[in-house]
Amino acid sequence: MHTKRIIPCLDVKEGRVVKGINFEGLVDVGDPVALAEYYNKQGADELVFLDITATHEKRGIMEKVVQSVAEKIFIPFTVGGGLQTLDDIKSILRAGADKVSLNSAAVRNKMLIKEGAFYFGSQCIVLAADAKKRSDNTGWNVVINGGRIDTGLDLLKWIEEATALGAGEILLTSMDADGTKKGFDLELTKAVSDITNVPVIASGGCGCLEDFYDVFKSNIADAALAASLFHYGELTVDEVKRYLHDKNVSVRI
């Protein structure tokens, strides 16, 4: 079993971290740099920043955030949200991100994956796929725009196509499980893991220590991502890793 990764995720709007964060001893919980350092110290393997700023004009703010974070932490970090063009990807990578995550833009223009992988390498291009189960239970569709638009695209076909175009990793979010705290969607994660050779990051639904173990024990995910669980201090990255280590899951301690 490869070493499994634990990845906190932060939503950033206009240069500030949003979505309630509750840490004792952190003066400014809205500062992405302070939070990145905090998670880095806790032993996070990577970080994901999602820029949820609506307007393109404010993209420059995110570049400054990325630059400040890159100066302070020494773990890989991925930046996504609103990256539409090759130039957008280039500026975020140049600012110091290790990888970019492409979601809605890749669905609208799949050549962005191919060009990104060609210029920057597949290892830089993460396909963020948000999945929703079809009402007839025959599989999953890809949803975009934060889950608001059902593209009608079959998820598994889309992942096969995106990896063939050069996506080097899949950030897979179950929109059905997201926010429920009832555990990762194991059926979905396994279905994706079965059809691809690139690493899969499970996201959406994590509510307790056992949920991390469940997604790793059957070896259907290479990494697990969580947000509110870490932000509210319910668990620390270190606690998760020690628990997994005790359960014989290979993690970096």
UniProtKB/Swiss-Prot annotation:
Biological or metabolic pathway of the protein: Amino-acid biosynthesis; L-histidine biosynthesis; L-histidine from 5-phospho-alpha-D-ribose 1-diphosphate: step 5/9
Catalysed transformations (reactions): 5-[(5-phospho-1-deoxy-D-ribulos-1-ylimino)methylamino]-1-(5-phospho-beta-D-ribosyl)imidazole-4-carboxamide + L-glutamine = D-erythro-1-(imidazol-4-yl)glycerol 3-phosphate + 5-amino-1-(5-phospho-beta-D-ribosyl)imidazole-4-carboxamide + L-glutamate + H(+)
Cell compartments where the protein resides: Cytoplasm
GO molecular function annotations of the record: imidazoleglycerol-phosphate synthase activity; lyase activity
EC number of this enzyme: 4.3.2.10
Entry-linked InterPro entries: Aldolase_TIM, His_biosynth, HisF, IGPS_HisA/HisF, RibuloseP-bd_barrel
Keywords from the UniProt entry: Amino-acid biosynthesis, Cytoplasm, Histidine biosynthesis, Lyase
Keyword Amino-acid biosynthesis among UniProt keywords: yes
Active site: D11, D130
UniProt keyword annotation of Lyase present: yes
One GO biological process term: L-histidine biosynthetic process
Recorded GO CC terms: cytoplasm
Description of how the protein assembles with itself and partners: Heterodimer of HisH and HisF.
Described function: IGPS catalyzes the conversion of PRFAR and glutamine to IGP, AICAR and glutamate. The HisF subunit catalyzes the cyclization activity that produces IGP and AICAR from PRFAR using the ammonia provided by the HisH subunit.
Similarity field: Belongs to the HisA/HisF family.
Protein name: Imidazole glycerol phosphate synthase subunit HisF
The species this protein was found in: Clostridium beijerinckii (strain ATCC 51743 / NCIMB 8052) (Clostridium acetobutylicum)
Name of the coding gene: hisF
